Amino acid sequence: MSSKAVAHPNIAVWIMALGIAFSMALVLTAVFNANPWEDHTYDLAPPIVAGMPAPHRDGREKMVCSSCHIVTPPAIGTGPGSGTLPIVQGTPAPHVDGREKMPCASCHTIVKKGSVAKGAKAAPLPAAVTPGMPLPEAVSVALAVAPAPAAVPLGNEAHERMVPFRYQGKVVSIAGAGARSVWGDIYIQINDGINPPIWIDLAPRWYLQAEGCVVRPGMFVKGTAFRDPTQAAAGLDYAMSVMANGEICALRDNHLNGLWANAGGMDAEER
């Protein structure tokens, strides 16, 4: 009887300690809910103009600027009125390459609705336009996206002629059969703001969904891929891995064999 009486308080203490530890874990998880594997603050870092010195002096100046910042091309001209179109006050920015986060007045003349900017030089009227005809104050131009290169059969010895490289950048466009069907391959066009945009063949859409690496336009992705040196950036590259949504997904092995071949896609429609 005495041994049982001594054991009960010890069990109660351990149960109470485990309950306190579990409660503290819940509180800390709710307070510090930042996932260290999530994508870094790529969308929060201010854009950097290509050719400008790095704004950091704590060691980050040795890193690639496009890892955290959107690199924009240098502006032509020295200020407002140097060939840029005016912007009507209150309208959304006409850019989608990172410049939409910059103050519009840095490059454009801000025009109030229904008025003409003071001191702005009137553009010459086209020959077919008569005086008195209202002219548009701002123009939104849609940028054309180059179509994705056609995929070619790789063969068993494709890895011997292709070279590996690292890629990173923002997803500009998505193409391939995976854009229409869960069973098709997904091609992404990425732009790092410095080099010409490239097309990369990732994997079937169901495999990306199963691995948690679904990509969308505007996302920052990076990884490793194989490229045919005879085609350079004009051809279709083949990804070995991709990091998206904070997840790192292996897509192909060193012989360019898709890892989804042994994964199976029986329940892909349910994911």
From Swiss-Prot:
Annotated localization: Magnetosome membrane
Regions of this protein lying in the Lumenal compartment: 32-271
Family: Belongs to the magnetosome MamX family.
Organism of derivation: Paramagnetospirillum magneticum (strain ATCC 700264 / AMB-1)
Residues passing through the membrane, by range: 11-31
InterPro entries: MCR, Multihaem_cyt_sf
Keyword Ligase attached: no
Keywords: Biomineralization, Heme, Iron, Magnetosome, Membrane, Metal-binding, Transmembrane, Transmembrane helix
Its job: Required for correct biomineralization of the magnetosome, may be involved in redox control of biomineralization. May function with MamY, MamZ amd Mms6.
Short name of one Pfam family: MCR
PROSITE patterns: MULTIHEME_CYTC
Motif (MCR 2): 87-110
Protein name: Magnetosome protein MamX
GO terms of molecular function: metal ion binding
Annotated heme 2 binding sites: 104, 107-108
Keyword Transmembrane: yes
Mode of membrane association: Single-pass membrane protein
Binding site for heme 1: 65, 68-69
Parts of the chain on the Cytoplasmic side: 1-10
Gene: mamX
Cofactor descriptive note: Binds 2 heme groups per subunit via the 2 magnetochrome (MCR) motifs.
Motif (MCR (magnetochrome) 1): 48-71
Entry superkingdom: Bacteria
Note: This bacteria makes up to 20 cubo-octahedral magnetosomes of about 45 nm in diameter which contain membrane-bound crystals of magnetite (Fe(3)O(4)).
Cofactor: heme
A GO CC term assigned to this protein in UniProt: magnetosome membrane
Cysteines joined through disulfide linkages: none
